[in-house]
Swiss-Prot record:
Biological function: MFS-type transporter; part of the gene cluster that mediates the biosynthesis of phomenoic acid, a long chain aliphatic carboxylic acid that does not appear to be essential for pathogenicity but may play a role in allowing to outcompete other fungi in the environmental niche via its antifungal properties. Is probably involved in the efflux of phomenoic acid.
GO cellular component terms, semicolon-separated: plasma membrane
Molecular-function annotations in GO: transmembrane transporter activity
Source organism per UniProt: Leptosphaeria maculans (strain JN3 / isolate v23.1.3 / race Av1-4-5-6-7-8) (Blackleg fungus)
Protein name stated in the entry: Phomenoic acid biosynthesis cluster MFS-type transporter
Chain ranges passing through the membrane: 102-122, 150-170, 174-194, 204-224, 232-252, 262-282, 302-322, 329-349, 375-395, 407-427, 435-455, 488-508, 524-544, 595-615
Taxonomic placement: Eukaryota, Fungi, Dikarya, Ascomycota, Pezizomycotina
Gene encoding the protein: MFS
């Protein structure tokens, strides 16, 4: 009797990656790393004067009994202020350096605490990768495993725009703390869940709370730093995110051996230690404190929120369940794509025509579509994140299948990439703000990322010629590829991506009007998470479909349910039941299909490289002396 599970298993993109338990560590990361996004961040530091102008105007109109809105007169005054003389601009820049009220050790604690929330969210994205089989065994609910990943993604993405808009009209401190509490409460639900349904609910709310923490962190760092310091501080977010992402599976694997529930309780322990800092040291920032709650909520685009939530949900579900839980041509997947298209069209019409909202209150910054620099930054952010995060996910999977690595070993294999990525992010934050140019970072980074991903991919015949292969049917990346080759390309990839993967958050704040800064950072967040989600979805689809078809040929006696159970990692130590020859063929089939996933990565790098050629050559982040 077969030792494999024989359940009819629906799997999301993520679960169909694990062939056996020892080879599954990073597989479930394919959908668990979804960098958070937000929308409509409150006015960042450079718009501080415009914000007060807007508040003063609103206060005057409110006291006169008029409708509290930003009038055309206020917009005109704002434009005049943004075109002041160079001397006036220099004076504002000089005064802006002292806007922060927290300095010294309290400021250090504040930065560490908000960055720690990013670390927890990144950790929660990937820590679940190693505990999926344990959860399935405890709850005896293999059929619902896909929702552990999809629910987390839906919970976060669904509130992208609505939550970001709330940050623009409510007190930043308390909305951030509310997001922290929601994330912690959801972690408690996941840890104490009595069944799979409760676990899924906890994952959904954890995704929503985590994105709220990310948006709040970006806001707090932006409004409390000057133009000169902001790139350096925002680069720390990418650094912490990368560290948390890599450590997630390692920590998850450790808890699986003890009790998987502590993978969620860990958030509560760290959160309890940091909560006093969040509560007492976080500065309050209220964009419209003089307005009543009803007046503030009247600025919220409820129709846009409903449409965006529906559009995101119906887009994520078919991408994740297509080809695994359901066939791509099934009625369910087709219906979801159709509904998604209709909702996106409705959202576009509603936003462009400002139906049931106003130009100042709508969810999406439609005006950015006419800004060349903003659109190029959006494209580059989406493309470069896809180019770097696809390898971050698939390189560990490669080592698990080809070398039999576990959680710790496969994480160590990523160190060349992560170390160079984090180091370059920090260097970029310092040097870009010092010299003022951003175009070279994107251009050189695109070249490096393209070269690295091309050599990690199966290219016929280009890659074969470059490495003097004579057999064009042999991929550069196969089960016997030298580790030194891979480490070298990892380092090159990290060196290239680090210069631009996080830079867009700071750059876009210099290329849009001050009155639009509330939209600017969230605009890049949408590109970042969209690029990661789309890139991983496409790469995993290439890998999963190819690997599944190959294994069906090699293992024709296995039923679909048994094959899916083995691939997902819930079917036991499957490879150990195979003879040596079949085991080698299975590993080769998986690795060869995995190499094809890097096509998505080098395509993203190519798009980023081409888009970077259109950037302006002007200097930004000018020092006060230079501005004068």
């Amino acid at each position: 009797m077969s030792t494999l599970c024989a359940f009819p298993v629906p799997y999301s993109t993520i679960e169909v990656l694990n062939i056996v338990l020892p080879y599954r560590t990073y597989s479930a990361r394919l959908l668990y790393l979804h960098a958070p996004l937000g929308n409509h961040l409150p006015f960042c530091h450079r718009s501080y004067n415009v914000l007060h102008l807007r508040q003063d105007c609103d206060s005057h109109m409110y006291s006169a009994g008029n409708d509290v809105r930003l009038s055309q007169e206020a917009v005109t005054m704002s434009d005049q202020r943004s075109h002041d003389t160079t001397a006036d601009q220099s004076a504002r820049d000089a005064s802006s350096l002292d806007t922060r009220k927290i300095h010294g050790f309290p400021w250090f604690l504040l930065v560490i605490s908000v960055l720690s929330s990013i670390f927890l969210y990144a950790l929660d994205n990937t820590i679940v990768a190693d505990i999926i089989p344990a959860i399935a065994n405890d709850f005896s609910s293999i059929n619902d495993l896909g929702w552990l990943s999809v629910g987390f993604v839906i919970g976060g993405v669904a509130v992208i725009m609505p939550l970001g808009k709330l940050y623009g009209i409510l007190n930043t401190k308390w909305l951030y703390i509310t997001s922290v509490v929601l994330f912690m409460a959801a972690s408690a639900v996941c840890g104490a869940a009595p069944d799979m349904n409760a676990e899924i609910v906890g994952r959904v709310f954890a995704g929503a709370g985590g994105i709220g923490m990310y948006i709040g962190t970006m806001i707090l760092l932006s409004i409390n730093t000057s133009d000169q310091e902001r790139p350096a501080y925002l680069s720390l977010v990418g650094l912490v995110w990368g560290i948390g992402t890599v450590l997630g599976p390692v920590i998850g694997g450790s808890f699986e051996k003890v009790d998987w529930r502590w993978a969620f309780y860990l958030n509560l322990v760290i959160g309890a230690l940091l909560f006093p800092v969040w509560f007492f040291l976080l500065p309050s920032f209220h964009p419209a404190k003089h307005l009543s709650l009803n007046k503030r909520l009247s600025q919220f685009d409820f129709v846009g929120a409903i449409l965006s939530i529906g559009a995101f949900v119906t887009t994520i579900m078919p991408i994740n369940f297509g080809g695994t839980t359901y066939e791509w041509n099934s009625g369910t997947i087709i219906a979801l794509f159709v509904v998604s298209g209709v909702l996106w069209i409705a959202f576009a019409v509603q936003q462009s025509l400002t139906l049931f909202t106003t130009p100042a209150d709508r969810m999406f910054p439609v005006q950015f579509l006419k800004n060349k620099e903003a659109m190029l930054l959006f494209i580059c952010a989406a493309a470069i994140n896809s180019a770097v995060f696809v390898p971050i996910y698939f390189i560990p999977i490669y080592f698990q299948f080809s070398r039999g690595d576990g959680a710790l070993d496969s994480a160590i294999r990523l160190l060349p990439l992560i170390f160079l990525l984090c180091a370059t992010i920090l260097v970029n934050g310092k040097l870009m703000s010092r010299f003022g140019y951003y175009m070279p970072w994107y251009l050189v980074g695109g070249v490096f990322c393209l070269i690295a991903n091309v050599f990690l991919c199966e290219l016929h015949p280009v890659a074969a010629v470059l490495v003097r292969y004579t057999d064009y049917k042999t991929a550069l990346l196969d089960a016997t590829t030298s580790q030194s080759y891979i480490y070298g390309f990892e380092a090159l990839l990290g060196l290239g991506a680090g210069g631009s993967v996080q830079a867009g958050y700071a750059v876009i704040q210099t290329v849009v009007p001050a009155t639009d800064l509330g939209y600017a950072v969230s605009f890049i967040m949408i590109a970042q998470i969209g690029g990661i989600a789309l890139g991983l979805a496409c790469a995993s689809a290439v890998f999963i479909n190819g690997a599944t078809n190959s294994l069906r040929v090699l293992l024709p006696l296995l039923s679909d349910s048994e094959l899916q159970s083995a691939i997902s990692g819930t079917g036991g130590r499957f490879l150990e039941t195979l003879d040596d020859n079949t085991r080698v063929q299975v590993i080769d089939a998986v690795v060869n299909n995995l190499a094809k996933a890097f096509i998505v990565a080098y395509a993203g790098a190519a798009v980023s490289l081409v888009a970077s050629l259109g950037f302006s050559r002007k200097r930004v982040f000018l020092p006060t002396a230079a501005a004068a």
